[in-house]
């Protein structure tokens, strides 16, 4: 339970905000205030339908007509255009002298962000226990699966027992 881990994670902002809520895990995000790398956005491979049985969440079923990120005639093209418009506005603001810490407010939630995430085996196991469930957003579940894979490599007996709630 006292094993310590640090992970370098890259995910969309909306996933980072979902995961930052976990107790006893320290997240140090790389800020656009100090980083001038090109921005990168997340676009899903499939636009999922809203789940019929919960207020939030999605089903495993794709929305007809929106299956491909390359279907620029439909919603994916609109998302791509919106992201580009936001980047153009961000760059214009920075090039006009606006501080990057303020200009970044125009960037969308699909912006990819990176962070160092540190905590104990117990804290990460608790996060995995909650975020590996079927009702967790798919993109968040992917991060939890990556963390769980690493936990099992280091603690092949304890990690599954902690995640399953046996320990």
Predicted regions and their residues:
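Family-specific signature for flavin-dependent thymidylate synthase
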Residues: 1-167
């Amino acid at each position: 339970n006292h094993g310590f881990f640090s992970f370098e994670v890259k995910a969309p902002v909306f996933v980072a905000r979902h995961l930052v809520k976990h107790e006893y895990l320290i997240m140090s995000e790389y800020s656009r205030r100090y980083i001038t790398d090109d921005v990168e956005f997340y676009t899903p491979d499939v636009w999922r339908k809203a789940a019929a049985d919960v207020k939030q969440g999605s089903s495993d079923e794709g929305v007809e007509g929106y299956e491909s990120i390359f279907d620029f005639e439909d919603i994916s093209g609109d998302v791509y255009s919106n992201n580009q418009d936001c980047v153009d506005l961000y760059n214009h603001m920075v090039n006009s002298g606006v501080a990057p810490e303020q200009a970044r407010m125009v960037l969308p939630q699909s912006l990819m962000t990176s962070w160092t995430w540190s905590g104990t085996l117990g804290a990460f196991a608790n996060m995995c226990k909650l975020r590996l469930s079927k009702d967790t957003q798919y993109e968040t579940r992917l991060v939890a699966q990556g963390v769980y894979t690493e936990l099992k490599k280091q603690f092949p007996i304890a990690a599954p027992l902690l995640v399953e709630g046996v320990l």
